[in-house]
Amino acid sequence: MYYPFVRKALFQLDPERAHEFTFQQLRRITGTPFEALVRQKVPAKPVNCMGLTFKNPLGLAAGLDKDGECIDALGAMGFGSIEIGTVTPRPQPGNDKPRLFRLVDAEGLINRMGFNNLGVDNLVENVKKAHYDGVLGINIGKNKDTPVEQGKDDYLICMEKIYAYAGYIAINISSPNTPGLRTLQYGEALDDLLTAIKNKQNDLQAMHHKYVPIAVKIAPDLSEEELIQVADSLVRHNIDGVIATNTTLDRSLVQGMKNCDQTGGLSGRPLQLKSTEIIRRLSLELNGRLPIIGVGGIDSVIAAREKIAAGASLVQIYSGFIFKGPPLIKEIVTHI
């Protein structure tokens, strides 16, 4: 397959520049006959989850296509679902560059992007143009300059604007790169947010005559007690699913490696075992009461199977996709 050669060339570039270059090419072909250049035939392996039918259990995690610019081209590669975003109500530039770093030996990435995106209105226009026939998730967050205590308003604004176009909505309260965001995972703040989100979901269901499930994305750095409290809150508020996990602040597996001391969230292979353990513990706590979407360090069929064995109904990839390319999609879907 050609990807090892493509990767070698892309890895000569700064990581964010490589991302921008790749998306520039994908934007050119998305929605055109040239999508055939990236199209892969993968077997149909339907999974029912959150009331939706996924063509196969493998999805693209949020963060790669923040603005929904390349939905069709990414869909042509064989993903059963694509999660775009994280998107915020207003455009924002994110954190200062450089803000994305490779840990090549560990096949990991550290990012402190900071929800850089062109805003929810722009994303909706891109979604309207797409023809992807898989499940489209839209991941939403709060603007950096919105005080945490008013953060729920940003989620509600995004929900209102995307509801008609989303297969499911992912609530990102676990990025380590927006100050204070992770505090929304705890106690009263979480209950307050989930109450508001559930009320808004009910209102929008009545308005649009369709039910769009809500999944909450959690961090891998939760203690046992915190994880139990989060699981309890999700069940009490009738949330439809949980995405486990986001990136980690833990650097124990990458000590001494180039870029290991960079601030931000670590993803890729170093996150693999940690996220799988969170899924296992979460699954025991939830006991089948809501489904888990497993993400974190999946870079092989074995890693995907481990997530499912731990309790995930669906899995997503991001860093593994960067390091292994489109062949990883076909490999996982075929053999999972």
Curated annotation (Swiss-Prot):
Pathway: Pyrimidine metabolism; UMP biosynthesis via de novo pathway; orotate from (S)-dihydroorotate (quinone route): step 1/1
Keyword Metal-binding among record annotations: no
Protein name: Dihydroorotate dehydrogenase (quinone)
Gene name as annotated: pyrD
Record note on cofactor: Binds 1 FMN per subunit.
Positions of substrate binding: 66, 111-115, 172, 177, 246-247
Subcellular location: Cell membrane
Lineage per the UniProt record: Bacteria, Pseudomonadati, Pseudomonadota, Gammaproteobacteria, Enterobacterales
Protein topology in the membrane: Peripheral membrane protein
GO biological process terms on file: 'de novo' pyrimidine nucleobase biosynthetic process; 'de novo' UMP biosynthetic process; pyrimidine ribonucleotide biosynthetic process
Species the sequence originates in: Escherichia coli (strain K12)
Listed EC numbers: 1.3.5.2
Assembly: Monomer.
Keyword ATP-binding applies: no
Family: Belongs to the dihydroorotate dehydrogenase family. Type 2 subfamily.
Cellular component annotations (GO), alphabetically ordered: cytosol; membrane; plasma membrane
Gene Ontology terms for molecular function: dihydroorotate dehydrogenase (quinone) activity; dihydroorotate dehydrogenase activity; FMN binding
Its job: Catalyzes the conversion of dihydroorotate to orotate with quinone as electron acceptor.
Keywords assigned by UniProt, alphabetized: Cell membrane, Flavoprotein, FMN, Membrane, Oxidoreductase, Pyrimidine biosynthesis
Cofactors (names): FMN
Enzymatic reactions: (S)-dihydroorotate + a quinone = orotate + a quinol
Chief location: membrane
Gene3D superfamilies to which the protein is assigned, alphabetical: Aldolase class I
Active site: 175
Binding-site residues for FMN, renumbered to this chain: 62-66, 86, 139, 172, 217, 245, 268, 297, 318-319
